Amino acid sequence: MTSSSTPRHRGIFPVVPTTFADTGELDLASQKRAVDFMIDAGSDGLCILANFSEQFAITDDERDVLTRTILEHVAGRVPVIVTTSHYSTQVCAARSLRAQQLGAAMVMAMPPYHGATFRVPEAQIFEFYARVSDAIAIPIMVQDAPASGTALSAPFLARMAREIEQVAYFKIETPGAANKLRELIRLGGDAIEGPWDGEEAITLLADLHAGATGAMTGGGFPDGIRPILEAWREGRHDDAYARYQAWLPLINHENRQSGILTAKALMREGGVIASERPRHPMPELHPDTRAELLAIARRLDPLVLRWAH
């Protein structure tokens, strides 16, 4: 039996950015290089097709191409989480089964929502995750993020963990994340196999103190985040604090300034990928914001700026 003390997956699982050519098509050669860099940088696993992967700008056919291409290229080097969020229970279940068939180690799904106003009651959220669970034999990570506009209380999340077979991991990104993680672990006990930090590691130390065993971050500097997690896990808390303080300016800049385009800007600057452009209509990173990002990063000498040279 797995539990929070013996999870199947722990550590840093950064989000893989989706790479596009300047013309907007998928750039699979760059995609493979991005994956190789992220593994070389110390990622314990990867997450694909998340919000930070611009999943909302990708067609269903492209989802299949990306999932197959990345999982075949990873070839078991690290476990891969595939994001399968959708408003429809049927679509999310089908996406999740397809991810499992292609080799995913886990799926991640937000609660069903659409736009700014379409939400469903708690009973339907429970049934949504239960039906997805029934369709697959790999763990589900519930993504509790403000983007869904859906309140998921710690008691409700703990109930799903106890009563739905595959619901075992939780990425908490809401305000007061550490307190919610702490309460979730208290209420759910061993059913909470993976309490995870998210939101680009901006609350990482508080979340680790609350009991988080994993972190889903941006993909630009896993080599900076992994040693923090390792130090904390090994009881070297002063070392963890010192390392976090060193990387915090870059973590903060990603979380509050350069956002979803951070990893691609760093990867493009380091020669890992050919283009950092997002898919239209998302605007490109402002030149001043990009320059500040690189100035902060160069002080830390992350692998991303050296890997391809």
Curated annotation (Swiss-Prot):
Per UniProt, subunit arrangement is: Homodimer.
Q: What class of enzyme is it?
A: lyase
Reaction(s) catalysed by this chain, per the record, are: 2-dehydro-3-deoxy-L-arabinonate = 2,5-dioxopentanoate + H2O
Biological source species: Azospirillum brasilense
Which residues participate directly in catalysis?
171
Protein EC: 4.2.1.43
Q: Which GO terms describe its biological process?
A: L-arabinose catabolic process to 2-oxoglutarate
Please give the GO cellular component terms listed in this UniProt entry. cytosol
- What Pfam families does the record point to? DHDPS (PF00701)
Keywords associated with the record? Arabinose catabolism, Carbohydrate metabolism, Lyase
For this protein, the record's SMART domains field holds: DHDPS (SM01130)
Q: Kindly indicate whether the keyword Hydrolase belongs to this entry.
A: no
What name does UniProt use for this protein?
A: L-2-keto-3-deoxyarabonate dehydratase
